């Protein structure tokens, strides 16, 4: 396989080890992780890393941040990988000069982070909103991706159906999100198969205390999620071909995307992708990294190693 060339690095792109002792709110506990800040034009991205070896990038969902992977990343790292967990723009402890977010803003941010860290290619594991950025990366910059594992979101070539409407019932509240409104409902039925401790929810939502992060909810949905959903509805990705081996995983208790619906929406995957596999995880809902961290790590490791 040809080695991809790194893009021209922004003049100010530089990673440096961060002392997080004075960060507010404090970072949640996660033994073994190191923390860096990658500075690029107008953006200071917090990146948590663990392990050494072939790189694996984990892209969090909404409203989570890097800590969503605190039970998954160490398991992958223990198998001999360097695991990189960035706080994407509008989340966690990343800081942006501009509050605007467009459809591919996070994609360009991610490419800058990969370049600043000297990562030519990496495996990518993504969940929920993070899967939008991962999907864009695999289609537009396949040379930067080894293999992809996508959690709780169907592939880009899925067909649209009225049966999808329940999956979007939360959207109006987020499109019109008012700063200060609670998001604790994300960790309730039908999204979780298990009861999530209050302390865990508090850790996920801690960065919402920062006005910048709370204010980012509407731009994320209006500027990125809705435009990308419109592209999916128009079948844009059905006119493209995915070359990256991809595993798509759902929780059995994810009532938005049960197996019969997913199979129906994603018929004839060989027509749209070189290699696309589906798996359904027992005792898990939409929030797979919370409900089944061991299973997520094992699925990813098996997929990375298979036929390699």
Cite the ranges covered by each PLM segment.
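Flexible "cap/lid" subdomain of the alpha/beta-hydrolase fold that forms the substrate-access gate
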Residues: 3-34, 43-47, 91-121, 125, ...
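Catalytic histidine-centered segment of alpha/beta-hydrolase-like enzymes
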Residues: 284-293, 297
């Amino acid at each position: 396989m040809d080695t991809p060339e790194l893009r021209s690095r922004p003049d100010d792109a530089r990673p440096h080890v961060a002392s997080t002792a004075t960060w507010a709110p404090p970072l949640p506990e996660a033994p073994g992780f190191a923390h860096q800040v990658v500075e690029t034009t107008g953006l200071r991205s917090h990146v948590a890393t663990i392990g050494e070896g072939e790189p694996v990038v984990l892209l969090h969902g909404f409203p989570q941040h890097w800590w969503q992977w605190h039970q998954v990343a160490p398991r992958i790292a223990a198998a001999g990988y360097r695991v990189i967990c960035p706080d994407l723009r509008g989340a966690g402890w990343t800081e942006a000069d501009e509050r605007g977010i467009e459809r591919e803003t996070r994609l360009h941010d991610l490419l800058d982070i990969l370049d600043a860290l000297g990562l030519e290619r990496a495996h990518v594991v993504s969940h929920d909103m993070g899967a939008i950025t991962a999907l864009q990366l695999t289609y537009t910059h396949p040379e930067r991706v080894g293999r992809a594992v996508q959690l709780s979101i169907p592939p880009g070539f899925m067909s649209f159906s009225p049966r999808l409407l329940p999956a979007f019932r939360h959207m109006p509240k987020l499109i019109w999100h008012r700063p200060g409104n609670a998001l604790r409902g994300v960790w309730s039925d039908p999204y979780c198969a298990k009861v999530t401790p209050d302390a865990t929810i508090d850790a996920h939502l801690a960065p919402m205390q920062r006005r910048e992060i709370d204010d980012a909810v509407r731009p994320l949905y209006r500027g990125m999620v809705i435009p990308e959903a419109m592209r999916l509805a128009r079948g844009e990705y059905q006119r493209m071909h995915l070359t990256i081996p991809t595993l798509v995983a759902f929780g059995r208790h994810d009532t938005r995307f049960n197996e019969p619906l997913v199979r129906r929406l994603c018929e004839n995957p060989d027509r749209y992708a070189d290699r696309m596999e589906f798996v359904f995880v027992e005792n898990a809902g939409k929030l797979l990294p919370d409900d089944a961290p061991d299973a997520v790590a094992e699925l990813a490791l098996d997929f990375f190693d298979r036929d390699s």
